[in-house]
Design a protein with these regions (language model features):
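Membrane-helix boundary elements
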Residues: 37-53
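Hydrophobic, membrane-inserted alpha-helices
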Residues: 42-47, 64-72
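Cytoplasmic-side transmembrane-helix entry/capping segments in multi-pass membrane proteins
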Residues: 29-39, 60-65, 84-90
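C-terminal membrane-adjacent module
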Residues: 98-144
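Hydrophobic alpha-helical membrane segments
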Residues: 85-103
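N-terminal signal-anchor/start-transfer transmembrane helix
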Residues: 7-26, 133
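Membrane-interface helix caps and helix-loop-helix hairpins in membrane proteins
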Residues: 25-30, 49-59, 78-79, 112
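Structural signature of hydrophobic alpha-helical transmembrane segments
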Residues: 1-13, 57-64, 120
């Protein structure tokens, strides 16, 4: 049930909660900047979860994830918009890995525990945003 609720909330936050107001109030250039920079706080949530659940053994993996998504966000902003599509799809995979491998992968990489339904929420949000970015990237690139 938590996953169904997570999916529904992810859809609501993505479409009427993010895409619609961003599209209405931001220019094409600002829209691209917004979606690029949004990757950074999204990745920060996992560091917060590490502290919240008191399992700092996963902190190194989460910091690496934060660095990767920050680099992807900056590359997308300054190089090619398609990188942003890849980044959001990769983040969806990152979310699913946290749900599936919450204990560890082969005992080598610890993963941060996440709230019930969070991976479903993020999967819906990230994939909807990735599809939207894909749809808009040509316009963004033409706008500069």
């Amino acid at each position: 049930m938590a996953n169904i609720i997570g999916l529904i909330i992810g859809i609501i936050i993505a479409i009427p909660g993010t895409i619609m107001p961003v599209r209405k109030f931001l220019s094409l250039r600002a829209e691209k900047i917004f979606f690029s920079l949004t990757l950074i706080p999204i990745a920060l949530f996992y560091i917060g979860f590490s502290y919240y659940y008191g399992d700092l053994s996963a902190l190194h993996a989460e910091i690496v994830g934060l660095i990767i998504f920050t680099v992807l966000a900056l590359l997308a902003q300054f190089m090619a918009s398609w990188i942003l599509v890849v980044a959001y799809v990769a983040h969806a995979a990152w979310d699913v890995l946290h749900e599936v491998y919450v204990a560890s992968i082969g005992g080598v990489i610890p993963w941060t525990e996440v709230p019930a339904g969070y991976a479903a929420f993020c999967l819906a949000y990230d994939l909807i945003i990735a599809a939207y970015v894909y749809k808009r990237m040509r316009l963004w690139d033409e706008a500069g």
